[in-house]
Amino acid sequence: MATRGGYGWMVAWGCLAVDGQAAGPGLLPWLEEVLVASVIAFDVNETLLDLCALDEPFEVLLGSAALRPQWFTLMLQLAFTGGLTGQYVDFTTAQRAALAMVAERAGVPLTAAGIDGLVGRMSSLPPHPEVPDALAALARTRLRLVALTNSVQPVAEAQLASAGLRGYFEAVLSADGTGHLKPAPQPYRAVADRCGVPIGQVRLVAAHAWDIAGALAAGCQAAFVARPGMVLSPLGDPPGITGPDLAAVAEQIITLDG
């Protein structure tokens, strides 16, 4: 039996029961509130946008495209360390610091202008090929679409505008506005507050296990985009939806929530 909001529920043999009692008509509004999402919140970097576009500048500036995923992982470490130690670091600052560290580790001199140029490319990443059509399909449903990213607000807006995706979202929310980066609970709660819905009606879509874990811990529902190299953690509850790309995930969201 799964639990949500202190209640137990189960589906078996075509019947839904709550705390062992059959779900009658009076429970249907409550069940819709806790089981059906009305707001779909999308992570941006790697979930919607393809960071492989940075491989060429990494090759040019640092001599190896293989340093790009190392840089992104190190950037996350720096950002999360800041949050855990009470010394908040925004995503752009973490990106710049991680790039300097990767360059030093590789023994490659990198100027401030080089750092500016590469970090600036984060604002013009292309979407993964299936993303525009998947978002268009979701936009034709009753669902409300928002973006929730750790990127600072100006970068987030620039990213989605450059990728041609901004028009699909009623709001673009930066975790930076809460003073806490995902996977802390505050950014996920900010989505519910902004949209005026219970947090259980928010479904996060992300390609990162840590983002899925944060959303579920905050009380959201979740959908995992299992892009190449991305896997879920064996720890904690799994998300209700998993698919190899956003097209597959969107199809399941439309079936369950749309």
Sequence positions of predicted segments:
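Alpha-helical elements of Rossmann-like donor-binding domains used by nucleotide-donor carbohydrate transfer enzymes
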Residues: E56-P57, A97-M101, G117, D133, ...
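An amphipathic alpha-helix signature
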Residues: D55, R68, F72, T92-A100, ...
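Active-site neighborhood of HAD-like aspartate-dependent phosphohydrolases
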Residues: L31-L76
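Asp-based, Mg2+/Mn2+-dependent phosphohydrolase catalytic module
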Residues: A12, L16-A17, L27-A37, P132, ...
